[in-house]
């Protein structure tokens, strides 16, 4: 979320695949997880595509999917995980856990004999260390926001080598979901953390063998602009029904592509094994499935959301230069006018070929438990948009150009990530409608990591079309919606809530997480969704369906909207 000059520089170096030999600790794996899937066979190279280069291999500080799509769940794992089909919490590095009667103490029993990919044993010390790092306010991680309970970070302690106890100030419904947090190795990262260098550790120029995890794969090679190669972790702790170690796949080559168009061409040429298909390509792919030896899956609406966000940050570096833009973007009527100018049906038709639904709420469309379907909606109407603009103090000059109360023409720039043709199409549709309202809109695509930098650290933008991954637990958005959140995009990391409605959201998230009964939680999160819909700090667009094309010889796949294709990567194998 790099400017071209930086991107050019990264092409200079190559991190080569390392042939690694480990001095493994002599420990017995006592609690292997055993698959219920069809027994597969070892071997084969899985080839898929990535949209853009990673920014870091440090899972703790990563906040963009170009990085987390490589690390999370593949190199690193949590104490618990969510099943990609049922979405239920399941054991991962912890084999089980106990909860006190008052719901404030959790005791996690770790799997004995699990090893890091370098052969060192995974123990409670690694869990404690990971929490120490997340708690450290000098480490810029969104995970800290999510783990706070009643404004406090949980108390945690090591009971013995394989037992960790965590205490929270009061019952907290999302707590187990928080334990999906990825654990990192103390023996590799303690020294950098102690010396104040943690945030620079495991960057993209790190020797692959230095990056150590418990996941099914390790980093084998990173060649900027070309590929990331993951190799099978020989020390992995999952097994099949015959006791053979997982994963089955030996190598996972992930080709770095510049656009969704390139990804589509790679699959059509038979160079990749599966593809997340754009709606505009789905029917064409379906017609050719038999001859292409692949099958198609429509798993329904994705959990991700796409939206337009405005720069309402008073720390915006261009505020003194262009203060009027801040006035426009903080004008509620202006934002509502833009919301009414969202032609979502055209977006669905042109960008998604009909494979999508309008998004009105910050809760993911498939989340039927917490989705509030009664929030305020802004059906497409340029007439209502004009009414809102008038109410907000705007008018039109003799040339039908929109001007503010000082007679200044409304002009700003909208950007999205280059290569994401769906977002580029949506952005063009929005820009066209706003031009019809008399605004002068400059729009352009930007490389993804550069986009994230503008949004999260430089704060140098007008409006951005971007998206967030979703989920089944609304508290996972506590790094976004509460005013102090690291991803509170329009005005991040506020010391005190900047508005009354933001203060109310802070309160609702606290109450929603503390409530025990689901019915009570729904009430709190319903109100939160209503506030976002009324105040429109972000304006939602449309949600695409999860569409996949998968080669027929890739077995044990169980694709879903929540888990995608790779949620059970350790079980996938190639048939002869």
Region annotations inferred by a language model:
Residues 541:
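Active-site-proximal polar cores
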């Amino acid at each position: 979320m790099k400017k071209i000059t930086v991107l050019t520089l990264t092409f200079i170096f190559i991190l080569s695949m390392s042939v690694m030999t480990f001095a493994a600790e002599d420990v017995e794996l006592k609690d292997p997880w055993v698959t219920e899937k069809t027994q597969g066979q070892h071997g084969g190279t899985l080839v898929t595509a990535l949209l853009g280069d990673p920014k870091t291999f440090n899972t703790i500080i990563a906040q963009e999917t170009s990085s987390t799509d490589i690390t999370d769940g593949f190199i690193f794992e949590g104490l618990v995980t969510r099943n990609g089909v049922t979405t239920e919490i399941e054991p991962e590095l912890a084999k089980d856990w106990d909860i006190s009667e008052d719901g404030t103490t959790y005791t996690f029993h770790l799997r004995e004999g699990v090893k890091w990919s370098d052969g060192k044993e995974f123990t409670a010390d690694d869990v404690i260390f990971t929490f120490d790092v997340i708690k450290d306010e000098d480490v810029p991680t969104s995970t800290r926001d999510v783990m706070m309970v009643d404004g406090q970070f949980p108390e945690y302690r090591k009971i013995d080598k394989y037992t960790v106890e965590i205490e929270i100030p009061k019952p907290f419904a999302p707590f187990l979901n928080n334990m999906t947090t990825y654990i990192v190795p103390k023996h590799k990262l303690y020294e950098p953390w102690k010396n104040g260098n943690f945030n620079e550790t495991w960057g993209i120029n790190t020797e692959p063998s230095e990056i150590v995890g418990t996941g099914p794969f390790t980093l084998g090679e990173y060649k900027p602009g070309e590929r990331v190669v993951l190799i099978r972790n020989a020390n992995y702790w999952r097994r099949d029904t015959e006791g053979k170690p997982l994963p089955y796949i030996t190598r996972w080559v992930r080709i770095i592509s510049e656009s969704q168009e390139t990804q589509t061409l790679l699959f059509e040429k038979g160079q990749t094994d599966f593809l997340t298909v754009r709606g505009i390509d789905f029917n064409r792919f379906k017609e050719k499935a038999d001859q292409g030896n692949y099958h198609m899956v429509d798993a329904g609406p994705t959990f991700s959301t796409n939206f337009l966000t405005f720069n309402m940050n008073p720390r915006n570096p261009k505020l003194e230069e262009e203060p009027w833009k801040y006035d426009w973007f903080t004008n509620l009527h202006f934002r509502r006018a833009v919301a009414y100018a969202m032609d979502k049906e055209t977006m669905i038709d042109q960008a998604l070929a009909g494979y999508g639904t309008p998004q009105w709420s910050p809760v993911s469309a498939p989340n039927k438990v917490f989705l509030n379907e009664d929030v305020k909606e802004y059906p497409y109407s340029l007439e209502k948009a004009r009414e809102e603009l008038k109410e907000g103090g705007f008018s039109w000059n003799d040339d039908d150009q929109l001007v503010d109360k000082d007679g200044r023409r409304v002009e700003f720039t909208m950007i999205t990530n280059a290569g994401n043709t769906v977002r580029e199409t949506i952005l063009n549709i929005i820009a066209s409608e706003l031009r019809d309202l008399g605004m002068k809109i400059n729009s352009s695509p930007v490389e993804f990591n550069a986009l994230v930098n503008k949004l999260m650290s430089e704060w140098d933008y007008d409006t951005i079309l971007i998206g967030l991954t979703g989920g089944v637990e609304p508290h996972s958005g506590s790094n976004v919606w509460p005013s102090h959140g690291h991803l509170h995009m329009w005005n991040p990391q506020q010391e005190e809530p900047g508005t009354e409605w933001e203060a109310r959201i802070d309160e609702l998230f606290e109450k929603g997480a503390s409530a025990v009964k689901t019915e009570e939680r729904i009430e709190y999160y319903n109100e939160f969704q209503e506030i976002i819909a009324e105040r429109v700090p972000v304006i939602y667009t449309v949600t695409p369906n999860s569409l996949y094309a998968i080669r027929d010889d890739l077995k044990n796949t169980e694709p879903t909207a929540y888990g995608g294709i790779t949620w059970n990567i350790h079980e996938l194998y190639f048939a002869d």
